[in-house]
Every structure is written in C-alpha cells, then in structure tokens.
C-alpha cells in the first residue's frame, strides 16, 4: 500500500466517523423538528417551516462552502460548520424553554448550514481516491448514516428522559443529543483530517490522469449543460424531493394516529437505515455496473415507496414504506454524486458540487414547505401521490439518457 493509499484510507475513515456522529444528530432532530414546529407555530400549516428553513439554509450555503473549502481546506471548513451547528442547537434549546418559534427558525437555519458542510465531505472522500474507487469511497462515507441511525435510536429516549429529569421539555432531548455529537465530531475532524483532502486530491489527480482536462475550470453553467451532469443533478435533486416530501410529514401523520414517540423514532430509524445501510453494496454496484442503472433502479424504488406509504398508518407498514423511500434515495444520491464527480476536474469539484447541493437543497426546501400546506389542506395520501408523480421524472430522464449516451463502466 502506497503512502497516498494509506492517507486516502485514513481520510475516508475520519469522514465516515464524522458522518456517523453528525447523522445521529441530524436524525434525532429530524424526527422532532415538525412536531416542534406544530407545537410553537401559530398555524398548523407552518409546522414544516422549520424544516424548510433548515433545508433552505443548507441550499444557500452549499455553494459558499464550495468556495470556502477551496480557500481554507476541507478540514477547517467542516470544523467551522460543526461549530455553527453547536450554536444552532443551543438556540433551539433556548427556543423550547422560551416557546419562541423565531429562535427555532434561527437555530435550524444554522443547523442547515452545518449539514451542508458535512454533506460535502462525501466529495472529499471521492477526490482522495482513484477514479475506479470513488463510488465505494462515497458509499463508505454515506454508510456512516447507518451508525447514525442506530446511535440516534439508542440515545433518543434516554436523553429525552434525562431532559425531563432536569426540568426541561421532553423535546429538548433530541437537541441535547445533537449538540454533544456535533462537538465530538468537530474535535475528531480537527485532529484526524490531516493532511487536508484538498491537497491530497491534487496529488491523486496527478497520479491518475483522467479524461477531464486539468486546466482552467469550466463555468458551472457550462458543466450543467452536459447531459451526464444534468442527469446526475436531476437524480439527486428529485430523489431528495420525493424523499423529503413524505419523510418530513410522517411524524405529524403518526402523531395524528396517536402513535408514541418511540413508534415515531422507530419508523424514522427504519427510513434512515434504508437511506444509509445499502451503501455497503451500492458503491460496489455503481463501480461494477455503471451509474445509470443504479439511478434508474433507485427512481423505481422511490415510486414503490410512494405507493406503499399511505396504505396503512400502522407502524410496520409505515416502517417498510419509509425503508423503501430511504433505499431509493440512496441509489439516486450515491449514483448521482458519483456520476457528477466523474465529470469534473480537480479544480471544478468543490464549486460544482456546492452548486449541486444548492439546487438539491433548494428543491427539497420548497417541497418541505409545500408538504406542510398540502397536509394541512388534505392528507398524507395526497402527498404520496404528488411525490409518486415526481419520482417518474428522474426515472424516465435517466432511461432516456442511458439509451442516448450510455456511460462507460469505470474500473
């Protein structure tokens, strides 16, 4: 094993651990955010506004993080993002105690910025690995969400009980958990993410010359006119839209059917397990079979999830449907991320990937806010129908792209 390979392995492991801790925090908060919104908002239709603000802030900060990562490095940028998340969680805790809906929005805005920084870590893992291992590297980082799923489920109820025991609201437990996990993650990144992936990625680019030229960076507008890039961004953006549309409202749907908090955590955990556990094989499948087939399969699974979700309000059927929702998202997300990374030179990656995450976040923020209004005016079934129709767009678009210009298998 060469020095570069050892460094790449170490960086991937550090990013995996960071993703595990951060995901546990985000998942713990995600199950509670709509419930907290419904509790503090003056209008029930605004229940998902905190989630929309969270997603929107992540979207608008994604491009900025791309520039920041190029300027100060991946390590310093991710640490800065986690510190903002710690502050955001502290504000939400104050908001719960003071019943301030505005403070909740500000706190979740900061947490959205944190999520944007952490999510770009998957591209840092890709850039330090050779082209034929990038799918597996991205999957390895995304796989940290499996640990996050288990960790959030294990901590959720005990920490909520602890919050109550010290005189805090039960809902505060999720944000206490997230604050602590972000703090641990920040220390691990600051100490362990050395040398910086930005610098390692430049060395890897010299060792593994690619078809994409290494000279002057193309404008983002030009890159996003390429068929493969359009396909990748569409898969990620609309896969995220379908997932968010159903996931964000499921907690409220279950509360309306008198489910316990433990039931809600179980269903959300099944969903996040579906999001992250398939990364064990999805990266290998991407590198072996090609990006397009996996994205196509993911879009089809999303459609199945949309059909299954409204069939029953019971925990088991909902858990299965939400697991499928996460599985379809995983294939679209990892497949799209890898396909996009394939199209970019080292000098184009951070900014283009930041722009991609902006588009993905913007789309998911819009559907998050829309879901609140749709749910208040109708029901869960209508949301599932809307999401199902949207899932057809990437399905047919990827199929068309594969027929017109199939991407050669990497490796």
Predicted regions and their residues:
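C-terminal ends and interior cores of transmembrane alpha-helices
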Residues: 83-98, 301-313
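Cytoplasmic helix-loop-helix junction between adjacent transmembrane helices
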Residues: 108-144
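C-terminal membrane-cytosol helix-exit motif in multi-pass small-molecule transporters
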Residues: 156, 179-205, 397-402
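Helix-to-loop junctions at the C-terminal end of transmembrane segments
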Residues: 61-73, 278-291, 375
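Juxtamembrane intracellular "pre-TM" segments in multi-pass secondary transporters
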Residues: 1-9, 194-232
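Hydrophobic core of transmembrane alpha-helices in multi-pass small-molecule transporters
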Residues: 20, 101-116, 317-331
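Intracellular juxtamembrane helix-capping segments at the cytosolic ends
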Residues: 33, 116-129, 331-344
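Helix-loop-helix hairpin linking two adjacent transmembrane segments in secondary transporters
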Residues: 103, 131, 141-191
